[in-house]
Amino acid sequence: MKKLTAMLLCLAMLFAFAGCGSKDTSSDKKSDGKKVLSIEEVEKTVPATIKKVEKDKFKIGLICLHDENSTYDNNFIQALKEAQKDLGLKDDQVLIKTNIGETDACYTAAAELADAGCNVIFADSFGHESFIMQAAGEYPDVQFCHATGTKAQTAKIANFHNAFASIYQGRYLAGVAAGLKLKEMIDSGKITADKAVIGYVGAFDYAEVVSGMTSFFLGARSVCESATMKVTYTNSWFDIAKEKEAALNLINSGCVLISQHADSEGAPKACEEKNVPNVAYNISTISMGPNTALISSKIDLSLIHI
């Protein structure tokens, strides 16, 4: 029964995200009544100010807060490479800048990419937004897309856009998996119901992090009603030592399961060391946590780049 439940949950996550990222070109109605536009219909919504570019002259740029060592940034990098493959772009048509802080360095990187001929430029960190908006104002012929941002609708800059997925939905399902594990631990007598305490390692107390942890907790409570959750912030998107320390502190305080919204492998590795179940983000942690990895939530960002 447990294996069947786990399989059904995995299928639910698969179809949930497949539905968000389907490449089907047919126009249809979703179950919630919203229309899924075909590629042809989407093209009609593109502003006339966006100029068409020949494929062999097209360039795309990506600005990352960290590099491949960050699970979050690596997800963007690998997604862009997947999009490159799908679109048939050459290596010199894809430019990636890594370790670009949430400072004027971001504007400089964006300007350099624009000067290098990029037609579309992505930036992946919340704190990049104001600098990307500045660049968008100075390079009106370049499209700037910012992940996790909030200002595109109000800024009214024609070539500035926000792009991300509703990851809180995936976090809810990941929370269900966590709740199933807690219930299993209670039913087996490993813990009592009042000890079903989750630890959550967050990067910052931003709305994106708070909405994600809230969805995760609601998912867990939908299965394990006695579940409670402790949250700690590292005040950094990527810090292996801080994230590991935060996870260890939560475990030492009585948390029997750990999840995270931070970008390193610190928390999953702490869980494996302490034999505590872990729900991860951005990557599968099965290889580094063969005894403790439960499930991960991840966005297929290649669809955004395409």
How should these model regions be labeled?
Residues 80, 171-227:
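An alpha-beta-alpha
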Residues 19-30:
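Bacterial lipoprotein signal-peptidase II cleavage site
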Residues 62-63, 115-126, 143-147, 252-264, ...:
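Periplasmic-binding protein-like
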Residues 207-254:
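Extracellular/periplasmic Venus flytrap/periplasmic-binding protein
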Residues 92-114, 232-251:
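Structural motif
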Residues 140-164, 283-293:
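Flexible loop/hinge segments that line or gate small-molecule binding clefts
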Residues 36-54, 59-79, 83, 96-106, ...:
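Extracytoplasmic "Venus flytrap"
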Residues 304-306:
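Conserved small/polar residues in nucleotide/adenosyl-binding loops
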